Amino acid sequence: MSTYLIGDIHGCLDELLALLAQVNFDPQQDTLWLTGDLVARGPASLDVLRYVRSLGPAVRMVLGNHDLHLLAVYAGISRNKPKDRITPLLDAPDADELINWLRRQPVLQVDDQLKLIMAHAGITPQWDIETAKMCAREVEAVLSSDSYPLFLDAMYGDMPNNWSPELTGLARLRFSTNALTRMRFCFPNGQLDMICKDTPENAPAPLKPWFDLPRLVDPEYSIIFGHWASLEGKGVPEGIYGLDTGCCWGGDLTLLRWEDKRYFTQRAFKAEAEINNNNGFAAGKEVQH
């Protein structure tokens, strides 16, 4: 029985299956944690969703910003961009079923036994574990409700970017969504910067990666995140694990086996990397909310 954690898949099903074959993944015994962004940019978003859903309780996943964007496109709130390559998913006969399954997935995973926390972008330094759980539950509740299109319509935007327990309504939900699925850099007081997409060494002062600021999360817990492909999993402090290594840009799909902290990688299959790079994209660029 092993715990496997995998970074952003982005529709790269063949690489996912090849990576799981390396470790002889057994859904009857093993648990698979996924950092979100299952869809977009890669060639097989539809089949990735079908496969992950078929694994049932063997999977513990979180939603990423591209997954939320897919929900908004399907709801008619956002435009379907050809570069995302999700049209086969939108047109699939089981699209309704898959979308309704997807919107009921969490935005935060916490395992108190393994002392593991997973969110697509990470945990804002302004939150402790209990605040993160509370805010995640609020987002999950509205996503799984009949009023979810109202939330999806309101989630796009960079403000508010400073946490306060006094935040309410859609503003509170937007902050929580940005913190859990879009965050990279923060100001020294923990306030989110939603503009800079650079690597840490090229970020303007006084911005710092969220994981380099003092945090309120219990240090006994490790934090798993994806989202930030240009990090290539490097430069993070002890107890923080960045697993997005840019498979859909020609990089790797990365798996971490938790029990022995061993990494496994699967290089992107060349043809798909060329398609994305020829379309003018660069590693680490994300859907803009």
Curated annotation (Swiss-Prot):
It comes from the Bacteria. Pfam families: Metallophos. The keyword Transmembrane does not apply. One of its GO terms (molecular function) is bis(5'-nucleosyl)-tetraphosphatase (symmetrical) activity. Its EC number is 3.6.1.41. Keywords: Hydrolase. This is Bis(5'-nucleosyl)-tetraphosphatase, symmetrical. InterPro entries: ApaH, Calcineurin-like_PHP_ApaH, Metallo-depent_PP-like. HAMAP family: ApaH. It is an enzyme of class 3 (hydrolase). It catalyses: P(1),P(4)-bis(5'-adenosyl) tetraphosphate + H2O = 2 ADP + 2 H(+). The keyword Metal-binding does not apply. PANTHER family: CYTOCHROME C5, PTHR40942. It comes from Yersinia pseudotuberculosis serotype O:1b (strain IP 31758). Hydrolyzes diadenosine 5',5'''-P1,P4-tetraphosphate to yield ADP. Belongs to the Ap4A hydrolase family.
